[in-house]
Amino acid sequence: MAFGPMMRLTTDRGLSVELAPFARDNLNVFVEGFARGTVTQYLSAHRVQTIETEQAWYDEMIKNKTSLNWGIWAVDGDKRQLIGNTALTEITKDHVHYATSGIVITDKKYWGQGIASACHRARTWYAFENLGLHRIKSAVIHGNAASWRALEKCGYELVYTERNEEFVNGKLRHMDCLECLNPADWAWRQWWGDDRPPRKSLEARKRAQAAVDWARQNVTLE
């Protein structure tokens, strides 16, 4: 389960992207990206990585049976460039099926182009419609407004806030813990049972459904 299947998609700005496996030989992309403090400042482990630490991570990742990873590849004609990765980790299929999502785009020239939002929608669609998950969890450090907006647009909502979770740029930062619930009727009924969903969850459900609908139209599963 180390890598998820290839998905091809086009962003709202017309950029071609592939979510696909990457090789050990591709890890320099992450070493170079994680050398920049602006890339790592809002990551839980904001440390510079070396090729040795990235290789150790890769070797563990490909053996992990509870995670699915995708490289984020920018495609321009016949050229493919690895610019980051996204993942579903801690995939659990007990009485409730859930996972934790994450993403990083290490090449800064691809920031602000809607790539993360498109990847969120593709990953969410795959998690709900192909893995049958009820819930996806994520977290955002305060100050990382772009990540918050991208996740919210995809159907994530705030569950609770961990105070003073990280120290970033000279100050303590809180961390918002988020969730995205599967909007399908069967999953929604199982999750809420006899409880009445609050208004914010109903609004998030509409956004999650819109994300899934977008992916159905714009994502090709290879």
Language-model segments: which ranges?
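A short helix-loop-beta-strand connector motif used in the catalytic cores of GNAT acetyltransferases and
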Residues: 59-71
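Generic beta-strand or strand-like secondary-structure segments
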Residues: 53-57, 71, 100
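Acyl-donor (CoA/ACP) binding surface of acyl/acetyltransferases
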Residues: 1-36, 69, 77-222
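Juxtamembrane/interface motifs at transmembrane-helix termini
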Residues: 49-53, 61-63, 105, 195
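Conserved GNAT-fold acetyl-CoA-binding loop/helix
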Residues: 38-59
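Generic N-terminal helix/loop capping motif
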Residues: 33, 37, 61-64
